Amino acid sequence: LIMSGFDTLLSIAVATNGQLVEASGVTEATARKIIHAARDSMNMGFSTGTDMMEKRENVHRISTGSKNFDTLLGGGFETGVITECFGQYGSSKTQIAHSLAVQCIKQYPESRVVFIDTENTFRPERIAQFAKGAGLEPEQVLAQIKVGRAFNSDHQMLLAEKIVDIVKEGDNVKLVIVDSLTAHFRAEFVGRG
């Protein structure tokens, strides 16, 4: 299981029987028992509202660099969740991503940002401009951003899986940006769904 990427209780607890059977060759019944044991040990049931409030108190926010935008978002982009920015072509989604990458590094100086670029929109010169505007050294900020250019949906999925390896290698990844999450899937799976 470990060699197949199931190296935490959580990864086992949220797996399907079929995934464990395929990864390890165990029977369906054994996979079910392993998953149930992982779920039992993690206490993956309900929580009280008080428990949820305590968890919410530990949520941090990454500033956008704009006080007005931060106010609209309740203080910035929440950590620990997936946030999607969507809009028409040219509506500044990529600019938000670039600014957020710089602001993350400003807020967490030892952090790293992972940027999966599916439309060839990552612009290091724009990052440098945002860094200068934030009072940071552009070269240092650029060194803290890992960029992967995804050429199709399979490559995009591979890059997403490699983020786990980056974290395991000790990089303090605080932000993952995928620009654009759906572009390759829309192009490759036309008419499905």
Language model segments and positions:
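Conserved inter-motif catalytic segment of the P-loop NTP-binding fold
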Residues: 108-193
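The Walker A/P-loop phosphate-binding site
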Residues: 2, 19, 23-24, 34-140, ...
